[in-house]
């Protein structure tokens, strides 16, 4: 049975990427809430084919930042969470688990930014992940630097979303 909740819909609509963070550690309670939201994410055939690697060590974060082309948020983040796909898992599920963690982060006042790791083999080496496991992205997390975020939005205001008429097709693409 589904429970209706306008708050969930609002959370999805209001979620924003945060690229600059305060120099402040995420509390244990907040981190556990974020990780637990990942744990509760649905998955194909309930496989739960993931492991979450939490990286706080600055040297590790710097090494991980070299594995992608657009990793600047890693440098000010308190931590990153790397969702690792186990061999029997699916990328679809990894996207679901990442989005749930980002929504949970926002719910406790923690900002997040999804970051693609373009050099998967390098990322696996940095994190000690076996070759048959997936390591394609991380989520940089921290408490938002509100002043920096306001300035970034002023320089590049949100453009909103395309109307549904441009995005939705019924029964066939064309």
Where do the PLM segments sit?
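Acidic, surface-exposed loops and disordered segments
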Residues: 1-174
